[in-house]
Amino acid sequence: MLGFTYSFSVWRGDVDPVFPYISAAGDNRPEACMFSMFLNICSFLSMLIVYLRYSLVAELNRSSDLLLKSFNRLNLYAGLLGASGMFLVANFQETAVIQVHLFGAFLCFGSGCVYMLGQAWISYRMYPLFSGIRIAKIRGVMAIASVCLFFMAFGFGWAAANTFHSVFPDLPTPRPWTHKLVPMPATICTVSQR
């Protein structure tokens, strides 16, 4: 779905085709309308998938493991919180309200990392009856990589903004960061979460 927005943004020359800054693809009209619509659909589908996974684990567990039952419910909240962050990113474009947009992105990716770690733990906990050790290990590796990349993206973005503002204190942070490798960790983090 979002590939359409990306393709349209590249065709119009609004983003760099190699390393696009994700929010820049949905910042100008008409891309902003398509970006919001498709990301809202993705957010709804993410909520649905999170709830279906919660229901599956709850049904397979059927109160036989109370710790797993409680943790599954907490992980449901983390997943729904991440999808809600995606709604914020979709509906508050970067140039409109940057604080809400960045909060939504942080919520989306941060809660997504927590959700992935939780799913990895649930898979380990459900082994050997309902989950294979291979899928549990794959989920664990992907979750740890996602957390590392999330902190790298956050850290490098913060450092880049501080460095820029130490030299140019009166200028706003330049956006979008196209034709630079700054959004690369965020892109890797996004890909690793799917």
Task: Specify the residue positions occupied by each region the protein language model found.
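Early transmembrane alpha-helices of polytopic membrane proteins
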Residues: 1-58, 71-85, 91-94, 103-124, ...
